[in-house]
Each structure stands twice: as C-alpha cells, then as structure tokens.
A protein has these predicted regions:
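Short flexible/disordered coil segments
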Residues: 25-35, 39, 114-118, 171-191
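Sec/Tat-exported extracytoplasmic proteins
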Residues: 5-8, 109, 140, 144-148, ...
Length: 205
C-alpha cells in the first residue's frame, strides 16, 4: 500500500482516488505479522476469565472474516462484516456468504455489537446490512441478465435508502462481486480494477 500511495501522483484519476482514500495514512514501517495459530469453522478459547467463541464466516469482506463472540457478556465483535454508517465492500465474497454471516449474527442475538468500522451498534444495524446485500443482489442480478457492466449497473441502481451511508462508490465493487458469483467465478476481484471502477463512479457527472 505504501508503494501505491507513493506512485499515486503518476497514476492519473486512479492515483487521485488513492490519495483521497489513503493519502492521510502513514503506511511506512508496517510489518506483516503472521498468526501463530489458525482454525477453521469454530473455536472456543479463554482470555483471562472470559470464554470467547471464534466463528469463521468468510470469505465475504475478506477470506478470513471471523466473528468473536463473548456469550456471557452478549457482546459480538464482527470485524469488517459490519460497517456501521458506511457502505460495506465485498473484496472476497460471495455476497451470499455475507448475507449468511448477518443471519448468523442475528441468531446469536448479541446485545452489543462492535463493528469493524463505526460506533458500537445493535442488531438493527445487522438487519440493515443484510437488507442492503439482499436488495443489491436482486438488483444486480437483473442488470447482469440484461448485459449491463457492473459500472453501468451501479449508476442505475438506487440506494437512496442508504443515502446517509458514506463511501457510496463501493457499490460498484459489491455489484462486481455479485456478477462474479453469478458467473461462477471463485477468485477475489482484481483490486486495481475495483479501485478504477470506484474512481469512475465517484467522478462528477
């Protein structure tokens, strides 16, 4: 990411979009730390005197999406399965997995939900996220059948219900993810192509 931001001034419209998104962050000196343990499905563990449940729900936002549930406290940490007050973005998908993840959260019935982005929330925020993806899936499928590109679909689908959510340009990435699911593609979408589409969607006029 640091290299991309450094090259952004030479990348035209895409570079300008990168700088708007990431220019205020300092990525220098960040080192990737690999996990010491992994799991799949579900795992229980203790942290101090608290029992935690780890629940795999990806791929959706990313391949490794995981919920962390503290059942005794009725608190759930969603990671980036929940963006409170902003459009989510399905980098890995499929969108149907994200909908299933929302259903899993609702079945756990937590009192407090700590999202990956935004303030602490309640289950109403999860229901709204689920409704967003269900609506988007249906609308995108119609336009996919009509032969529209993801960008054309993004420009034609109304998301007025979520007008107060930020980062509306992410819509095109979510639509591209639905298209990939409908076409049977299993690899994550190309990030550079996705950023270019977001930049185009955000372009005035």
């Amino acid at each position: 990411m640091a290299a991309l931001v450094a090259q952004a001034p030479q990348m035209g419209e895409l570079g300008e979009f990168f700088l708007r998104c990431f220019g205020s962050f300092d990525f220098d000196g960040i080192e990737l730390v690999l996990p010491q343990e992994t799991f799949s499905g579900e795992r229980s563990m203790r942290v101090g005197d608290r029992e935690l449940q780890l629940i795999e729900v990806g791929p959706a936002h990313t391949r490794g999406d995981t919920l962390v549930h503290a059942p005794a406290e009725r608190v759930l940490f969603t990671g980036d399965i929940l963006f409170a007050g902003a459009h989510p973005i399905a980098w890995a998908g499929p969108v149907s997995n994200w909908i299933a993840a929302c259903e899993r959260i609702l079945a756990l019935a937590p009192e407090v939900i700590v999202p990956g982005h935004g303030p602490p929330s309640e289950t109403a925020a999860v229901r709204e996220c689920k409704a967003y993806f269900e609506y988007l899936y249906d609308e995108a499928r119609l336009r996919h059948d009509e032969g529209m590109t993801a960008l054309q679909a993004a420009r034609s689908i109304s998301v007025d219900r979520w007008a107060d959510w930020g980062e509306g340009e992410r819509l095109v990435v979510n639509i591209a993810n639905v298209y990939a699911e409908l076409d049977g593609e299993t690899e994550p979408i190309n990030a550079l192509v996705a950023f270019q589409q977001m930049a185009e969607l955000q372009r005035p006029g």
